[in-house]
Amino acid sequence: MKKIFLFLSLVSVLGITSLFAISYDDNEYSRKSRAYTQLAEKAYDAGEYDTAIEYSQLAENFAQESAEYIKRMMARNEAEDAMNKARTRYAWAKQQKADKNYPTEYLIAGEAIKAGGIAFDNKNYDVAVTCAEKALESLKTVEPEDKVIAKAAADKAAAEKAAKEKAAREKSAKDKAAKEKAAKEKAAKDKAAKEKAAKEKAAKDKAAKEKAAKEKAAREMAAKEKAAKDKAAKEEAARKAAEEAAARKAAEEAAARKAAEEEAARIAAEEEAARKAAEEEAARKAAEEALYNEKGEKVLPSEYKVLTWKLDRECFWNIAKNPAVYNDPFMWRKLYEANKDKIPESNNPDWVEAETILVIPSIRGERREGLYDPDVKYQALPKR
């Protein structure tokens, strides 16, 4: 039984000593462990089993102390390597001015290295490794100073570009608002001018009718006064000539009545002729205004979709020349002024993009609606 125990003890000692044989093996404890192992083997061979057991236990104790020593030294080396890496990274970060560019990360790393150094001095190697790892983790985002400067310059350029683009958008919005305001003001002025013209025309028509009525009443009054004067003169002449001849008086009275009837008939004929002429003029104007609708043709378009220049030679001149537009190429400027905010360059009427929808303003009060259809026959706008 003692032989078996002694054998197992020797195997255990040899196992412990071989576990850390790679490094730090030649230390005070390992040397004593090996010495007692040899003594145990000799005592065992000599049959001194109790002595061999005692030596083997001493060898095992020193082997355990050697293993703990090796473990401490390995932990110390690991902590030392970790702290050296952290200090090296910290020194590099300082050269890159991390204290200015990454103040928070730099401060955290410095405090961690300081704490790690204290832990290392107190042989708390695990704590030292943790502190070193914390410092390295804090400094991992630190970049070289030239890269930081380049990034700052790029960020500044991007911010300036964004500011310029924002200013351009704001200016474009203001310009658009100004154009829309000007267009609304122009439309309001045009509407007011049309309303004023309509009122003036109505006033003129009313004045003309009143003048015609007054002239008619004056003519009727003059005719009545003349008839009365003629009648009085004839009656006076008849009274004076009563003695001369009753027959002549009767003839004169008949002639006076006939003259009065003829005058009344003439005035009535003139009034009837004036009335018919006014009715015919009104009918003629109504017929002219209804020409665009009563012939079964579509109302003139209010919009025009631009085709291509290369194939269709589309431009303001040719579009204005279209019978359904203005039937007059010289009206191209009217079309341009109404649509210059839709072309790439508002001050360049020669550049009109295909697919652009142009507005066709009315130039004579003609009715317009819908998009121009090249397959529909329109009543051409009469030329002046």
UniProtKB/Swiss-Prot annotation:
The keyword Zinc does not apply. Residues 236-288 are annotated as: 6 X 8 AA tandem repeats of [EA]-A-A-R-X-A-A-E. Tmp may serve as a porin or transport protein for large molecules. Residues 163-292 are annotated as: Disordered. Residues 1-21 form the signal peptide. It is found in: Cell outer membrane. Sequence repeats lie at residues 151-155, 156-160, 161-165, 166-170, 171-175, 176-180, 181-185, 186-190, 191-195, 196-200, 201-205, 206-210, 211-215, 216-220, 221-225, 226-230, 231-235, 236-243, 245-252, 254-261, 263-270, 272-279, 281-288. It is a peripheral membrane protein. To T.pallidum TmpB. This is Treponemal membrane protein B. Residues 151-235 are annotated as: 17 X 5 AA tandem repeats of K-A-A-[AKR]-[ED]. Keywords: Cell outer membrane, Membrane, Repeat, Signal. One of its GO terms (cellular component) is cell outer membrane. It comes from Treponema phagedenis.
